[in-house]
Amino acid sequence: LIIFSYLFDILAIRTKFPSVILLVFTGIIARFISSSYGFDNFEFLDTLVPVLGTIGLILIVLEAALELDIKKEKIQIITKGFMAALIILLINIVLVSIFFEKVIGLPNPTSVIYAIPLSIISSAVAIPSASGLINKNKEFVVYESTFSDILGIMIFYYSIRQVEKGEALIGLEPILTLVGQIVLIIILSLAITYLLFQLIQRIEHHVKFFLILALLILSYEIGKDILKLPSLVLIFIFGIFLGNFSNLIPERFKKYVKTDNVGKEDLHEFNLLTAESTFLVRTFFFLFFGFSIPLESFIEMEPY
């Protein structure tokens, strides 16, 4: 499976066809072969696939953020990436929700909730597929797809909360609450990033970066599941800071934030660990995702 995934990556670079699509198709074919031999008990995938998906999304966004070179001249491309993500996401939500209402017959706001995941330009697909692009275009894809993930998750949880309360999706009070959550997650992300950065410098054990990844994933889950915050912002901020801390820390604050114990070798080691882990988790997630799709769902028009 690892060899196939590696070959798919090489093929994606040369053909610009997303390697993750090939992995999903491979999983679907494997499911068909397995079912033809009478192996149909795949209930364990209902638990495994979401876990791999969460870890994979975190690692993909982290890897992308670590590679970004943040400078003043990059503000324009960051702004363009954000605006493109927001506009495309909103247009997609409107169009897909209308399709669900008119063609499938889903009621509103259920159609909107179903439309949101399909409207996101997922970084899990876009970032790996952009590996063969020139740096400028690759950076734009990273920013646009990452912002699409973040905005999509925020809108999704916002919509679910509104439906659970029996309130309209658009209103002044809930929108102000959403803005407050964004401000809160940014503040928490900065605090957690500072603590993890200090922890990297203080750990003397030869195995420390897996601990940092574990703490980062734990913080993400607490923010997403318990606090109901858009925790992908945390991953994005941590990755950008760790990859650009020498440029991002103002001179007057450098005496409070020590960076002497974090060298280029440490960053290279962390980048390598993140890249290898991302490749491994991404491989098994999309394979198992394709494997988890019931074959009969391709001819079913009724939503789950």
What does each of the following model-derived ranges do?
Residues 1-304:
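Transmembrane helical cores of multi-pass secondary ion antiporters/exchangers
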